[in-house]
């Protein structure tokens, strides 16, 4: 831990990432507060503009769900937060949950090219920003389920894999 802190303190600050939790992160239930609050709109914009938008982005390969990270980050940087959420949720129907629980520091953020010299892009917080944006506004970014075709499927288990499978099958 101490070595990690020393390394992060020695990194150049020219590409310092903003870490300004929004006012929404303040909860009336202090024991229920999240450890890392959401980014404000301004902080999300600044953070997204730090991205290098790599051609063969290692963050995509490091993501277990294969989310196109540079695309959704670029959409946030251009103000298309709804489009960013669509990119995320099309690849991973549980993108809003994963933004909170996925160990991004060892997956996509751990693979971030920018992380070699500076702090990596806060991909998890940007993902959370985009998915929270559409959820808070009641915006539906996914296509409606396909019409019934007469086939029925039973999925055993209601964990992430079962829910993801059900969503994919409903689109067929």
Predicted regions and their residues:
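N-terminal Rossmann-like FAD-binding beta1-loop-alpha1 element of flavoenzymes
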Residues: 152-172
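Ferredoxin-type iron-sulfur electron-transfer modules and their immediate structural context
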Residues: 2-152
